[in-house]
Regions:
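Small cysteine-rich, disulfide-bonded extracellular modules of the LU/uPAR three-finger superfamily
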Residues: 1-141
Length: 141
């Protein structure tokens, strides 16, 4: 084997978020979403080495990342995606999406799926998280 051999394929991670009403199918948001690359690299290494907690367990929600002025203009703050302690601006709610966890109260609708097409060099992870009527409890819609 040659010492000059290099694998240049690399790894590409892209985030995407789609928020929609499951009853009416109305789509509210369908766009690219920020990735925390340092945490993703740690998660991938821990998953492949079967060491630590490099898996998706929960989805967190919050506020403070956007503001709306009196004329309706929406301003988005820069995502907190640097440093291992980076987090949402103001986390207000968390829901378990690991459908193998005993802490998941609705694994049929809050779940993880992998989707792969044979012959391609990518696999999608689809995270489904349903915020039902009255969730989060005590917060206005």
């Amino acid at each position: 084997m040659s010492d000059n051999m290099q694998d240049t394929n690399g790894v590409l991670v892209q985030g995407h978020i789609k928020i929609f009403d499951p009853e009416s199918q109305k789509v509210y948001i369908n766009k690219r979403n920020a990735i925390h690359y340092e945490n993703m690299s740690i998660a991938m290494a821990e998953s492949l080495a079967n060491a630590g907690e490099g898996f998706i367990y929960e989805m967190s929600f919050g506020n403070g990342g956007t503001s709306v002025d009196p004329t309706g203009i929406i301003t988005y703050l820069t995502p907190n995606s640097t440093g291992t302690n980076a987090s949402l601006y103001n986390q207000t709610y968390t829901k378990v999406v690991d459908d193998r966890s005993v802490n998941n109260t609705d694994p049929a609708r809050n779940k993880l799926e992998t989707r792969h097409v044979s012959g391609t060099n990518y696999t999608d992870i689809v995270v489904s998280c349903l915020l039902d009527y009255g969730e989060p409890n005590g917060q206005d819609a």
